[in-house]
Regions:
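Serine-hydrolase catalytic machinery in alpha/beta-hydrolase-like enzymes
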Residues: 3-108
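Primarily recognizes the serine-hydrolase "nucleophile elbow" in alpha/beta-hydrolase
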Residues: 99-153
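Glycine-rich His-Gly loop
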Residues: 35-40, 119, 162-163
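Acidic beta-to-alpha connecting loop that harbors the catalytic carboxylate
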Residues: 162-166, 190-192
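Short beta-strand/loop motif that positions the catalytic acidic residue
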Residues: 157-161
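Loop/turn elements at helix/coil->beta-strand transitions in domains of secreted/extracellular proteins
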Residues: 29-32, 56-59, 110-112, 134-138, ...
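C-terminal catalytic histidine-bearing segment of alpha/beta-hydrolase fold enzymes
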Residues: 183-210
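Conserved alpha/beta-hydrolase "acid-adjacent" motif
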Residues: 166-172
C-alpha cells in the first residue's frame, strides 16, 4: 500500500519485477506496465497479465482504484459523463504513482507507459492516454465499454472484446479509423465480460495471456 498524502488516500498496489531485472539499468531502462483492475475485482486478480509482462521484461504495477470510502460506480447513462469522476480519480492515482515510483525504480522507464485494464480499469487507461498522450506508448484493454479509445498515431492499442455485451457508441474504431490508427480490436468468441481475469475459464485466461 502506498499513500497519497495530498488526497489522504491509500492505494493498494502490487509490484512485480521482470524476470530479466538484472539487465535493467539507469542507462538502459526496462519498460513499465500498469495493470488496472476491473470494478469490484482485486488488483491481484490479473496475475496472468503480470506474468506475461514480467516474462517480456516489464516492471508491473497492479493497482486497485476503488476504496470502500469511494462513491459507488454510477449506473446512470450517459456513462461518458456520469463515470468521468471515477475515471479521473483513477487517472490522478496513476499520475501520482508514476511520479512516486519513478524515483524509487530508476532502472525503469516511466516516460513511455503501457497501460493495461479490464472493464472500468480499461476506461481509466483510455482516459489517461487521452489526457497524457506523450507519456503512453501502448494501451491494452479487456472489454472496456465506456471511454473512447484514443485516436492517436503514437499510441498502439489492443482491445480484446467479450462476446456478451456491446461497447457504447464511438468507443471502438470504425473501419476507416482502423486504417488510420495503430489500433487492433479482437473479439474473443464465447468470452464473457466478467470472466476476463484470473478467475475466468482456463481457455480464456490462456487466450488472454498471449
Amino acid at each position: 500500500v502506498i499513500t497519497d498524502e495530498s488526497r489522504n488516500r491509500t492505494i493498494p498496489i502490487n509490484i512485480t519485477l521482470p524476470s530479466n531485472n538484472a539487465k535493467c539499468t539507469e542507462q538502459v531502462k526496462c519498460p513499465v506496465a500498469f495493470i488496472n483492475a476491473g470494478y469490484g475485482i482485486s488488483h491481484n486478480g490479473y496475475t496472468f497479465a503480470s506474468n506475461a509482462f514480467n516474462q517480456r521484461g516489464y516492471l508491473t504495477i497492479a493497482v486497485t482504484h476503488e476504496l470502500k470510502s469511494d462513491p459507488y460506480l454510477n449506473r446512470e447513462q450517459p456513462y461518458l459523463t456520469t463515470r468521468m469522476e471515477n475515471w479521473h480519480r483513477g487517472v490522478v492515482t496513476l499520475k501520482f504513482l508514476v511520479n512516486e515510483l519513478s524515483s524509487k525504480y530508476p532502472a525503469y522507464d516511466f516516460t513511455k507507459l503501457t497501460l493495461f485494464g479490464h472493464s472500468n480499469g480499461g476506461d481509466i487507461s483510455a482516459l489517461y492516454g487521452s489526457i497524457y498522450p506523450n507519456e503512453v506508448s501502448t494501451i491494452i484493454t479487456l472489454d472496456h465499454r465506456r471511454m473512447l479509445i484514443p485516436r492517436n498515431k503514437n499510441i498502439h492499442v489492443l482491445t480484446l472484446r467479450g462476446s456478451d455485451y456491446p461497447a457504447d457508441a464511438d468507443v471502438l474504431l470504425n473501419d476507416s479509423e482502423l486504417n488510420k490508427f495503430p489500433v487492433t480490436q479482437i473479439m474473443i468468441e464465447k468470452s464473457r465480460h466478467n470472466d476476463m481475469y484470473d478467475g475466468g475459464p482456463k481457455w480464456l485466461v490462456d487466450r488472454m495471456s498471449k
